[in-house]
Amino acid sequence: TRPCFSPVDHPAVAAARRAMSAAFGQDVLFTREGGSGPEADLAAILGAPLVFLGVTVDSDRIHAPNERVEMALLLKGAEAAAYLWDELAAVADDLAAAR
């Protein structure tokens, strides 16, 4: 698969950042993660960036033996997803203009 990158100044990325900050009660940091999914193709087809709400930590060993996830972080991720709907609705005009 090709690399996929979402610009941090895109309105959808800013909305995700605000949603995560609201759920976790503090500012969040951007990270880059590797993967082998179809994200680049999906972003190209939709003509929009993809935004992931990551709620795992390195010690969770995702897709490795003894994989785990902290329930408290998983629930905060669900809370962030709920905030994200409001944030995206608030910037709907900006999202349309960014396409």
Where do the protein language model's features map onto the residues?
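An extended, acidic, His-containing surface patch that forms the Zn2+-binding/catalytic region
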Residues: 1-99
